[in-house]
Amino acid sequence: MIDELIERMKKGDRRATARLITLVENDEEKAREIIRKIYPLTGNAYIVGITGPPGAGKSTLLDKLIKEARKEGLIVGVIAIDPTSPFTGGALLGDRIRMQRHSTDPGVFIRSMATRGSLGGLAKATNDAIKVLDAYGCDVIFVETVGVGQVEVDIVKTADTVVLVTVPGLGDDVQTIKAGLMEIADIFVINKADKEGADATYFELNLALDLESDKWRELGWRPPVVETVATMNKGIKELWDKIKEHREFLERSGRLKEKRRKRIEEEIKTIVSGIIAGKVEASIKRGEFEEIIRRVSQKDIDPYSAADMILKEIIGGGLSVQEN
């Protein structure tokens, strides 16, 4: 079945591509098989992460950015991360409905992914979905997240360019941003820039960035602050140009290759950690380490030594959690 879906995907079959994303999102074993088979086809798409607090108008902004990319004949993929209500189990799509106008365009593939409360695995599922869209043939893939928490940080770390969207009047929004995404944002956007307080937000953001001037000098890229009014299409072309400018900078400086290599390193570490944690969990559930747990309870051994013994049992030695 998977081989057939992949063959159909290679021919541009959208339904087969959607099915593959569903499988990588929900079936761990099939996800492994799919990624193994499509991996040689990946590495061509440019990934743009779009994040920021709820109500910043990210979906409207993204709707306009899709248009800019399509004007250039680019095939566009969109992965929109939806927070799922714990009460209804439904995704809160809100103004993402606007993006659906592109759904009849064969050059645009839009996919919503719900958190379903399993935040830990969401970054991995997003990463795998990106690979499917990359293999499908997307030139640019936008990943939109809601909020500015750790999960969003983990997800946008899968991007080549990170766009952080804020709006005037969010109170201590600059402080909030500094606590979360300031470190990894490549471009800042003040959307709804026709609202009162836009100038103050622009000044505050630039001031915060200027305090890090040594860092930008060393990096070679000082994140620009772009003002937009997405509903009126103002500033969209400038934002799209800045995204392309950042890509050119990354490619020219060799940082894109470096960034992607680092991402692969992190991905492998995450996968290895997940495999080991899964094996340990399964072994404990089967009662295989009752004796070790009993010895820790009786203070015969400490938890670090117990963990070391369990790891040696599971992976045959060579990996220790004890301090050097």
UniProtKB/Swiss-Prot annotation:
Its EC number is 3.6.-.-. It is an enzyme of class 3 (hydrolase). Keywords: ATP-binding, Chaperone, GTP-binding, Hydrolase, Nucleotide-binding. It comes from the Archaea. Disulfide bonds: none annotated. GTP binds at residues 52-60, 194, 229-231. Belongs to the SIMIBI class G3E GTPase family. ArgK/MeaB subfamily. May have GTPase activity. May also bind and hydrolyze ATP. May function as chaperone. This is Putative GTPase PYRAB02490. It comes from Pyrococcus abyssi (strain GE5 / Orsay).
